[in-house]
Amino acid sequence: MKVRNVDNNFVAAIGKSGIYPFRLNICLYFADGFLIDAGSAFILKKIKNFLSDKKVDCVGITHVHEDHTGAAAWIKEHYNVPVYLHEASIEEAAVKSSIPLYRFLTWKNRKGFAADPMPEFIETEKYRFDVINSPGHHPHHVVFHEKNKGWLFTGDLYIGRRQAVAFKDENISDSINTIERLLTLDFDTIFCGHSGIIKNGKEKFREKLEIFLHLRDRVNALQSEGLSFEEIDKRLFPDKNIWELISRGEWSTLNMVKTV
């Protein structure tokens, strides 16, 4: 994993997960004993190496998807520390994941683990991270805000300014509402679960919001003409994204159209 020093006792680690052509970036953030997200089981050995010289005090997981929880069971067993997760996802986390082949080739299945209910904030000696519910990519997604530093750890809420497809659990209207709330916060830097460290984060979120709102306007206009969601999808997205084909519709433009 590539490791980058961000601040005093705060490092970011980026690793590649999956086999070709499914390889994608995964980012972990370790700040003063607090680990944000637990990567995928595919890179478990790399995560173990990354943490080998670190004292982990607790883990905060942005959401229960397998690319953010892959090392959670090992961390819980090895360090015996709290692994915090949205309370509504604790039952799901306790059971080993069962995922389609394309996701297995990218992330692998994670073991079940005993998660701890997410507190309102997580405080270390140097930092305080406020926990903010942020539904959109997942209904039980959270972000972590270190307001004194202007940092926002966004899990899978941001990824990039323009979104090509939406996951089956995703709700774009929820993402819009969440982004509008987050834009009232004081932050400059986004720490994304896959795209890494992004400066001018508030402006990037504004751009993403505008793109979503423009899509909503287009969908509403076509609905007013009597088009169905499927017809609107074909009109707005005539060429299918490769991930839509590989995932057999788990990721789709249609879900963007339906939920915006």
What is the predicted function of each stretch?
Residues C27, W107-R128, I132-K168, W251-V260:
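Mobile, glycine- and charge-enriched loop segments
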Residues I36-G39, D57-H65, V83-E87, N133-G136, ...:
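Active-site neighborhood of phospho(di)ester-bond hydrolases with catalytic His/Asp-centered motifs
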Residues M1-K54, V143-G155:
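Conserved beta-strand hairpin/beta-sheet module of binuclear metal-dependent hydrolase folds
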Residues N133-P135, P139-R218:
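Metallo-beta-lactamase
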Residues K45-T124, E210:
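Active-site HxH/HxHxD metal-binding segment of metal-dependent hydrolases
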Residues M1, T184-D186, I197-V260:
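Accessory terminal helices/loops
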Residues A12-I19, L35-G39, V59-T62, F129-S134, ...:
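Short, flexible loop segments at the rims of nucleotide/cofactor-binding pockets, characterized by
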